[in-house]
Structure formats: structure tokens, C-alpha cells
Amino acid sequence: MRIRELLIGALVVVTPIVTAAQGTPAPKAEQIAAAVLPLPPDFRASARVLGYGADGKLTTLREGKGMICLARDPKAPRFHVACYAESMEPFMARGRELRASGVTSAAEIDTVRFREVKSGKIIMPKFPAALYSLTDGDFDPKTGTAPGARHLYVVYIPYATAESTGLSTKPFGNQPWIMLPGTPKAHIMFTSSM
């Protein structure tokens, strides 16, 4: 009996991974519902949603303004959706372009983007810009929830430092902290338990 339970448990864990690895995009309505899930409810209806067409290419699934949400990549091994202020789109879009061109190192992507911000090619927001995301777990289209997903909330403040914000550069308990201080990608990290 114990072996049977373990096999069934393994099948439950492996099935979503195999399905995701097949690379078939979810139906448009499901992609939209999952993509906007990290947002506060009052932002969901107006957000622009980028998702995947039948050809597997990123496309606009729904026009909107204020926030941009990315649906789950059907080729990714785990569930991840994110939404960010549209003022961050030049920076985010450039990251997607670099990954699509074969650059896979996060450090290399940031090196290119930081150089382009410095040269004026990428314009960063003048005011703080939020990002909301959900990672792991999986989206349940029947309930419209993502059981087991972890929330992440950040606020981008380009070039902010510990001195300019009064925030530590190291995480401590449930306190906010600043990550990548002094760079174009400087942002305040918030824990979901706050």
C-alpha cells in the first residue's frame, strides 16, 4: 500500500512538470486569469497582459494600462507569473529580447541593460515602480487561485541606496530591504508575510 501511495504521489508531482515541458500554451482566458493573479484585485481588470499564442511566441493577449502582466511561459519548468508598472517596460522588454537572442546569464543581461540605461537607450522610471509575482505551485483554473505559489513584492527605485532610503541592504526577518543598491535595478524587497 505504501509503494502505491508513493507512486501516486510522484505522479501528482511529475504531471504538472511534464505538461509544462510540452510547451502547449494554456487557453487565452486561463493565461489572462493566471497572469493578473499577483495584482491587487482593483488593478486586475485594467492590466495589459502578455502571453503565448499557439505558435509559442509572446504576444499581447489583452490591451490595458498602468500594469503589464506576463503569463506563464509554457516552456518553463515551473509556474511563474509577474506584473509590473508599465514604466518598467523598456527595461523588462530588453531583458526578454536578450534572453530570446540566447543570453541566459542574469549577470550578463543586467550588464547590457545597465550599460544601455547609462547611455540613455533604456529610460528608467522617475518614480518608484511596483512588481508583483507568484512562483511555484500551479494555477487552478477552476478556483482561479495558485495553491502553493509564493508571493514576491518589490518596488523599483533606480539608483537608490541604503543611505537614500534608510533601508538595510540585507534581509532581516520581515523587514523591507534594498537589493542591488546604487544600480538601475535597485529595488525594495517586501516579504509576503508583511
Name each model-derived stretch:
Residues 2, 19-22:
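N-terminal entry module detector
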Residues 10-20:
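Hydrophobic h-region of N-terminal signal peptides that target proteins for export
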Residues 23-194:
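Primary mode marks residue(s) on the alpha4-beta5-alpha5 output face of response regulator receiver
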